[in-house]
Regions:
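N-terminal signal peptide c-region/cleavage motif recognized by signal peptidases
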Residues: 4-6
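Short hydrophobic alpha-helical membrane-entry/anchor segments
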Residues: 232-237, 245-262
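Flexible, surface-exposed loop/linker segments and immediately adjacent secondary-structure boundaries
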Residues: 8-229, 244, 248-251
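Short, low-complexity, Pro/Ser/Thr/Gly-rich segments in the mature regions of secreted, periplasmic
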Residues: 256-276
Length: 276
């Protein structure tokens, strides 16, 4: 387990979202509580919290703007930044130390931006759905992709693979596909079409891409984010079944009817179930 130092003490108590779904071992630690504790459904997640999932653990984090951050097993993430103004949009940032993840933008794309960092890359996200994996899982997928990707000298701990998925069926009407950018080694690669991918093999290397991820690679990535075998059932049923349960009473204190989003499957070429 990783731990926090005193330098992070100032980043505490500012709520960024809640744990919307939890399966298996999911632990949380921060500067005030350096000893990891078990995360429960509806638990509030604060700025600078470090979240770690175990071998069978998975978590869906619902942010205040109704964006969602889902992490698979054996993953480590930290929410570094979150600014939300309903009238002006929001900006958020997270660090994925290792493991697989999915980020889905909230109901409105306008004025929203997000950034996800890995040990070797910075990923900008603008109004879309993005999946990625950091570490050995990224390297394993890369071995079966285009020649430039599979022959890259990839580091098994830090290699980073990113795939643009596009908006889900539950996104606000009129929402566009959005875009993502991957920056490393002073070079930026833009992903503007669903299923475009970029691969950063190691620190200091420029991103390889954009390239279209293979069906096998996409399936492997999807399995890392949403494993079919979900020991505790809750997250597997909610996400694999295509339903995202919003918890408005926890997020904003209101009593509105829960909203539902959609989770694209690995074979949805445009990132929208049932659409070509």
């Amino acid at each position: 387990m990783l731990s926090w130092g005193a330098a992070n003490a100032q980043n505490s108590s500012a709520q960024v979202g809640v744990a919307a779904a939890v399966v298996g071992e999911v632990k949380l630690s921060n500067a005030q509580s350096p000893k990891p504790k078990t995360v429960a459904v509806r638990e509030r997640i604060a700025l600078a919290d470090l979240i770690q999932t175990g071998k069978g653990g998975r978590l869906q984090l619902l942010l205040l703007d109704r964006s969602t951050f889902t992490i698979g097993a054996n993953s480590v993430i930290r929410i570094d930044r979150f600014v939300y103004d309903p009238s002006r949009g929001r900006t958020s940032g997270a660090t994925v130390v290792r493991g697989a993840f999915r980020f889905m933008s909230g109901q409105s794309n306008r004025g929203n931006s997000a950034a996800v960092s890995s040990p070797v890359a910075t990923i900008g996200i603008r109004g879309t759905i993005l999946e990625g994996v950091v570490g050995e899982g990224a390297r394993d997928i890369a071995k079966h992709e285009d020649k430039a990707v599979r022959e890259a000298d990839a580091d098994k701990k830090t290699a980073t693979l990113v795939v643009l998925r596009g908006p889900g069926a539950g996104t606000e009407p009129g929402a566009e596909v959005g875009a993502a950018s991957v920056t490393s080694g002073g070079v930026t690669v833009e992903l503007t079409e669903p299923m475009q991918a970029a691969f950063v093999p190691r620190a200091g290397a420029a991103p390889i891409g954009p390239f279209r991820i293979s069906p096998g690679g996409l399936s492997s990535l999807h399995d890392q984010v949403f494993p079919e075998k979900s020991g505790g059932g809750g997250l597997g049923k909610a996400l694999l079944g295509g339903a995202l349960i919003i918890l408005p009473a926890v997020i904003n204190g209101g009593g509105k009817k829960p909203a539902r989003g959609s989770t694209p499957g690995p074979n949805d070429p445009a990132g929208v179930p049932g659409k070509p």
